Curated annotation (Swiss-Prot):
Organism name: Natranaerobius thermophilus (strain ATCC BAA-1301 / DSM 18059 / JW/NM-WN-LF)
Keyword Cytoplasm: yes
Function: Responsible for the release of ribosomes from messenger RNA at the termination of protein biosynthesis. May increase the efficiency of translation by recycling ribosomes from one round of translation to another.
Source species, domain of life: Bacteria
Protein name: Ribosome-recycling factor
Keyword Cytoplasm carried by entry: yes
Pfam families: RRF (PF01765)
Molecular function as annotated in GO: ribosomal large subunit binding
Cited PANTHER family: MITOCHONDRIAL RIBOSOME RECYCLING FACTOR PSEUDO 1 (PTHR20982:SF3), RIBOSOME RECYCLING FACTOR (PTHR20982)
Length: 184
């Protein structure tokens, strides 16, 4: 039974971690290097992740600075940022690329809050599906007489506690991101 609990918790933890990384890439009006995650640069004919070609920092709340390790790649990096859907316009001075992060409009904030809620709800569905699968496994063990009915019920209660813990964590992550979006 312990393996069922561990497996369920592991899957729920993975779902929460996935939600956190998805939400980190949502632009909330302040400069965050994770905005540029997932951008690949055509570097000598190979698609290379931007963070392997440059140092990305946020020296000010509304400014990202991309400092290429190889200055000859600056044009390629600029093109990759323009082609991506981050919605930022690069300003290239030959040494570094500066990206000014504009203030979010009220409409865009509301749109982002909806996206956050949708991603959160999708993650809750994943967690609930994990709970269902774990409970089904416990019922199967009970049916095969490997565990008693009492053990099955205790196991389902334990699975519910784990589920509640992760649903609460998902809500906390969603609320923090919504706060970040609406407070700027």
């Amino acid at each position: 039974m312990d393996s069922i609990f561990k497996d369920a918790e592991q899957k729920m933890k993975k779902a929460l971690s996935s939600l956190k990384s998805e939400l980190a890439s949502l632009r909330a009006g302040r400069a965050n290097p994770s905005i540029l995650e997932g951008i690949n640069v055509d570097y000598y004919g190979m698609a290379t992740p931007l963070n392997q070609l440059a140092n990305i920092s946020a020296p000010e709340p509304r400014l990202l600075v991309v400092q290429p390790y190889d200055k000859s790649a600056i044009e390629d990096i600029e093109k990759a940022i323009l082609k991506s859907d981050v919605g930022l316009t690069p300003n290239n001075d030959g040494q570094v690329i500066r990206l000014a992060v504009p203030q979010l409009t009220e409409e865009r904030r509301n749109e982002l809050v909806k996206i956050v809620r949708q991603k959160g709800e999708d993650t809750k569905v994943v967690v609930r599906n994990v709970r269902r699968d774990a409970n089904d496994e416990l019922k199967k063990l009970e049916k095969e007489k490997e565990i008693s009915e009492d053990e099955s019920i205790r196991g389902q209660d334990e699975i519910q506690k784990i589920t509640d813990k992760y649903i609460k964590k998902i809500d906390e992550v969603m609320n923090a991101k919504e706060e970040e979006i609406t407070s700027f």
